[in-house]
């Protein structure tokens, strides 16, 4: 009303206002001492345009449904789709998970692999048997010599040769050093993913010492190419066995410190107990091996059930879990490190003298001293490293107990110097296939704990 008065140019004027389109007068309280204002016809006509009187043209016109609003529909609630990785620091490489979350609860976990695929199995078909060996270092690049050991045993089975005893003891010695390397990486990075940073720094100092043993024996810290078909590349340098003994004597103290930090830690137990539970039946159905199988209560270790090299001559125990959760698998790995120290001590005590390569000039390259005096040795050396040696036709599946599980090599020979087919069985591939089952129903943060306990390396998964 005040706006209407201001529009007419009057302030405080008592009047009766004619509502547009109707003959109803609205009384207005008159002010004292002011004459009453009456709106004229011209003023009232300016509001007449808003009223539409029915006519022939407008008889069939219907007003638009201004108030005919659709009723509200129920909102469709969908689960969140989350991409975990491949650049996530807890993905342990190039893992990509497409997860379906209900709040923070995992409903589905779909691993997408292949981001580190390099065509290793096909590349091996174009190399000689010796040239194919370095590819195995780059599969599981945390446990290098164990991969070499599996491939060398497969080639030796096709060639029907057996390396000398000293070479076999050296293989077992460095196989257990490699197991320590792998389990240090597995346990400490698992703890690092869950927020415990100290074990990572403590045990990586010990890991550095083992890399020095690698370097002294082969010249390389990681990709050693030391274990070869027919034996090992070269003998142990002087003083190395003494240094390994000193290391193994002190390493058990580092393991005690690790267990003081983690084993009875309330936070660590809450994050790992009853997380990622796998029953014994499920572990067998998924094809699990190694710690993933033993953590569920199945005592299966190829070093015991199908011993290779000289594992039948050493004494060690196989730790087994009971619940099949992340905590049991952690305890299994720590105890396996202690058993590896037992095996290392026996290797140092029982190391025999003798040759480190099979005495067959068609398979093993000659010594440098012989090459300088014998023309035949020089020819053998040249032929071995250019054309390679012919392997009799046949096929073999050879498996070893790698730190992550059963690492198998299916090797097919057609009688030439190059493999016809080399199929690699990686333990991490089967473990990753069970990630959906293990993580379903857990929180998003528990998926990190489950990935850590699986100990996955994508060099061997993607190949």
Curated annotation (Swiss-Prot):
Outcome when changing residue 308 to C: In LHONAR2; likely pathogenic; functional testing in a yeast model shows decreased NADH dehydrogenase (ubiquinone) activity
InterPro entries listed in its UniProt record: NADH_Q_OxRdtase_suD (IPR001135), NADH_UbQ_OxRdtase_49kDa_CS (IPR014029), NDH1_su_D/H (IPR022885), NiFe-Hase_large (IPR029014)
Record's comment on post-translational modification: Dimethylation at Arg-118 by NDUFAF7 takes place after NDUFS2 assembles into the complex I, leading to stabilize the early intermediate complex.
Keywords: 4Fe-4S, Acetylation, Disease variant, Electron transport, Iron, Iron-sulfur, Leber hereditary optic neuropathy, Membrane, Metal-binding, Methylation, Mitochondrion, Mitochondrion inner membrane, NAD, Oxidoreductase, Primary mitochondrial disease, Respiratory chain, Transit peptide, Translocase, Transport, Ubiquinone
Reaction catalyzed: a ubiquinone + NADH + 5 H(+)(in) = a ubiquinol + NAD(+) + 4 H(+)(out)
EC number: 7.1.1.2
Subunit structure: Core subunit of respiratory chain NADH dehydrogenase (Complex I) which is composed of 45 different subunits. Component of the iron-sulfur (IP) fragment of the enzyme. Interacts with NDUFAF3. Interacts with NDUFAF7. Interacts with CERS2.
Primary role: Core subunit of the mitochondrial membrane respiratory chain NADH dehydrogenase (Complex I) which catalyzes electron transfer from NADH through the respiratory chain, using ubiquinone as an electron acceptor. Essential for the catalytic activity of complex I. Essential for the assembly of complex I. Redox-sensitive, critical component of the oxygen-sensing pathway in the pulmonary vasculature which plays a key role in acute pulmonary oxygen-sensing and hypoxic pulmonary vasoconstriction. Plays an important role in carotid body sensing of hypoxia.
NCBIfam families cross-referenced by the UniProt entry: NuoD, PRK06075.1
Name this polypeptide is given: NADH dehydrogenase [ubiquinone] iron-sulfur protein 2, mitochondrial
């Amino acid at each position: 009303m005040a706006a209407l008065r201001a529009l007419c140019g009057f302030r405080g004027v008592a009047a009766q206002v004619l509502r547009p389109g109707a003959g109803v007068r609205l009384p207005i309280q008159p002010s004292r001492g002011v004459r009453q204002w009456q709106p004229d016809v011209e003023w009232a006509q300016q509001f007449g345009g808003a009223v539409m009187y029915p006519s022939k043209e407008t008889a069939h016109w219907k007003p638009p449904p201004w108030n005919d609003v659709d009723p509200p529909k129920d909102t469709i609630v969908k689960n969140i789709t989350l991409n975990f990785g491949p650049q996530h620091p807890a993905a342990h490489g190039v893992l990509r998970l497409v997860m379906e979350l209900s709040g923070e609860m995992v409903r589905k976990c779909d691993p997408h692999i292949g981001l580190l695929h390099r065509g290793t199995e096909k590349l091996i078909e174009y190399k000689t048997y010796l040239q194919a060996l370095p590819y195995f270092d780059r599969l599981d690049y945390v446990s290098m010599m164990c991969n070499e050991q599996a491939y060398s045993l497969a080639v030796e089975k096709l060639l029907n040769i057996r390396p000398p005893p000293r070479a076999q003891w050296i293989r077992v010695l460095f196989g257990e050093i490699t197991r320590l390397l792998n389990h240090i990486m597995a346990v400490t990075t698992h703890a690092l993913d869950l927020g415990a940073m100290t074990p990572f720094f403590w045990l990586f100092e010990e890991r550095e010492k083992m890399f020095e043993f690698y370097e002294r024996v082969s010249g390389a810290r990681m990709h050693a190419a030391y274990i070869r078909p027919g034996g090992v590349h070269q003998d142990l340098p002087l003083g190395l066995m003494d240094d390994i003994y000193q290391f193994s004597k002190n390493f058990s103290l580092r393991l005690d410190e690790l267990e003081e930090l983690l084993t009875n830690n309330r936070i660590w137990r809450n994050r790992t107990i009853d997380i990622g539970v796998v029953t014994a039946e499920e572990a067998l159905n998924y094809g699990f091996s190694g710690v993933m199988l033993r953590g569920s209560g199945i005592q299966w270790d190829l070093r015991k059930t199908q011993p290779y090299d000289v594992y039948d001559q050493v004494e060690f125990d196989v730790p087994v879990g009971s619940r099949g959760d992340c905590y049991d698998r952690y305890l299994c790995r720590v105890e396996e490190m202690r058993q590896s120290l037992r095996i290392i001590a026996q290797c140092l005590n029982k190391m025999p003298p003798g040759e480190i390569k099979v005495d067959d000039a068609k398979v093993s390259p000659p010594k440098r001293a012989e090459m300088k005096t014998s023309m035949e040795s020089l020819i053998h050396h040249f032929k071995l490293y250019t054309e390679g040696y012919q392997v009799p036709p046949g096929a073999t599946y050879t498996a070893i107990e790698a730190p992550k599980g059963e690492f198998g090599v299916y090797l097919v020979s057609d009688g030439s110097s190059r493999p016809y087919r080399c199929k690699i069985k990686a333990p991490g591939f089967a473990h990753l296939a069970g990630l959906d089952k293990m993580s379903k129903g857990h929180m998003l943060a528990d998926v990190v704990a489950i990935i850590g306990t699986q100990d996955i390396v994508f060099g061997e998964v993607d190949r």
